[in-house]
Amino acid sequence: MFGLKQFYQNEVRTKLAQELDIKNPMLLPKLEKIVISVGAGAYAKDMKIMQNIAQTISLIAGQKAVITKAKKSVAGFKIREGMAVGAKVTLRNKRMYNFLEKLIVISLPRVKDFRGISRNGFDGHGNYTFGINEQLIFPEVVYDDIMVSHGMNITMVTSTDNDKEAFKLLELLGLPFAKVR
């Protein structure tokens, strides 16, 4: 792998400064963290499946996953306060760039009928979120080891509050956005 962090520092920053007309290099947008999360849904009651989901995310991210718990009880969903409802991993620095590079170069091309990720995942504050339907696109996941097939949400948090600047940053980093029709 070619080192996405070096690519960002050597090439992306200069292109961003030119295209966004930013003179101060400290004001250039940068990727701060990537959060990978899974909601267990109907499998929340089964702790073995929850452990398997957390283990799968840990394999994908290269860092131990945290099991998330419900903040309050919701009778309609049969959830009690403190009950395990999902798992998440927050990646920063070297692991963040390694994961992003693996996602762009290896995993997303393995998605069937892939035409790019949606441009509609920006939240208005410079953060981008998209979902993946199956965890099997990652090379670390072995089909025989998973108990249940699940997707995941991937959130990329940037240092800018502007969606246009965040889009330009992610596009220059190599995220394959879908073409506008």
From Swiss-Prot:
Gene Ontology CC terms: ribonucleoprotein complex; ribosome
Source organism, top-level taxon: Bacteria
Pfam families in the record: Ribosomal_L5, Ribosomal_L5_C
GO molecular function, one term: rRNA binding
InterPro entries: Ribosomal_uL5, Ribosomal_uL5_bac-type, Ribosomal_uL5_C, Ribosomal_uL5_CS, Ribosomal_uL5_dom_sf, Ribosomal_uL5_N
Classification via PROSITE patterns: RIBOSOMAL_L5
Record keywords, A-Z: Ribonucleoprotein, Ribosomal protein, RNA-binding, rRNA-binding, tRNA-binding
GO biological processes: translation
Role played: This is one of the proteins that bind and probably mediate the attachment of the 5S RNA into the large ribosomal subunit, where it forms part of the central protuberance. In the 70S ribosome it contacts protein S13 of the 30S subunit (bridge B1b), connecting the 2 subunits; this bridge is implicated in subunit movement. Contacts the P site tRNA; the 5S rRNA and some of its associated proteins might help stabilize positioning of ribosome-bound tRNAs.
Protein family per UniProt: Belongs to the universal ribosomal protein uL5 family.
Quaternary state and interactors: Part of the 50S ribosomal subunit; part of the 5S rRNA/L5/L18/L25 subcomplex. Contacts the 5S rRNA and the P site tRNA. Forms a bridge to the 30S subunit in the 70S ribosome.
Protein name, entry field: Large ribosomal subunit protein uL5
Organism from which the protein derives: Helicobacter pylori (strain P12)
Lineage, top ranks: Bacteria, Pseudomonadati, Campylobacterota, Epsilonproteobacteria, Campylobacterales
